[in-house]
Amino acid sequence: MLNGKKVIVVMPAYNAARTLLQTYREVMEHGFVDLVIVVDDASGDDTVAVAQGLDRVRVHRHAQNLGYGGNQKTCYRLALEEGADIVVMIHPDYQYTPKLLGAMVSMISSDLYDCVLASRILGGQALLGGMPWWKYVSNRFLTFAENVLLGAKLSEYHTGYRAYSRRLLEQLPLAQNSNDFLFDNQVLAQIHWLGFTIAEITCPTKYFPEASSINFRRSVKYGFGCLGTGLQFRLAKLGWLTSPLFPRKP
């Protein structure tokens, strides 16, 4: 716990057996983490076996692959069932450093923010950390377009390292979101729609063979999906579109 609030870390896992333990160890170095939830999305390796051997870890396995977004839906449902006040999502592939947990959680436990993002773009070190140039360029373009459509000023919308307050998660219509990688992007658009506050901190970038990634073809599909989400947001704001992603208050 931190400031009297229960902290749960969720890890959407897929073939993460080689990096899960290292990620877990650094997460648990923070004495305030009450529980880690690992949701395995029908991995073909020993991810479940590794997770089951760890202390203060709840393991849930999908019988079939539900996708990155589908995995997160399970993560957040289980975290809320366990009584989490603050939920941190970090990939178990060790691409993001768990050393930022303290800063991220404290910003929510102090009631300053409801969402904290670990941005790979802030600080200008993304390319030096190994981010492929085409991913960097597409990240910057999509972020610019989405900031215009959403009326926001985020440095990026595509990080997989996030912290949320319970009250935020309980209001997000997550069931309406994609089961694929677009899920994360839709969540941020929904947060803006509901008027919750978002903070960002800089996060070192680490790209290596074990780190998860999506190929160019799926990245293109994801990019068009992000633009579509932003357009839906803008049209819904103007009252020209009704979307289950952005429900109107009764």
Predicted features, each with a name:
Residues A84-D93:
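Short beta-strand-to-loop acidic/aromatic patch adjacent to the donor-nucleotide binding site
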Residues A16-T19, S43, T97:
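Donor nucleotide-sugar binding loop of glycosyltransferases
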Residues D40-V48:
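A conserved acidic beta->alpha catalytic loop
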Residues R58, H62-Q64, Y68-E81, P98-F181, ...:
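Acceptor/aglycone-binding surface of glycosyltransferases and processive sugar-polymer synthases
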Residues N15-E29:
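Short, well-formed alpha-helical segments that are part of the catalytic scaffolds
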Residues I8-P12, I37, R61:
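Short hydrophobic beta-strand elements that form part
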Residues V27, D41-A42, L66, C75:
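Conserved short acidic donor-positioning loop in nucleotide-sugar-dependent glycosyltransferases
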Residues M1-G4, G151, A175-P250:
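Hydrophobic helical membrane-anchoring modules
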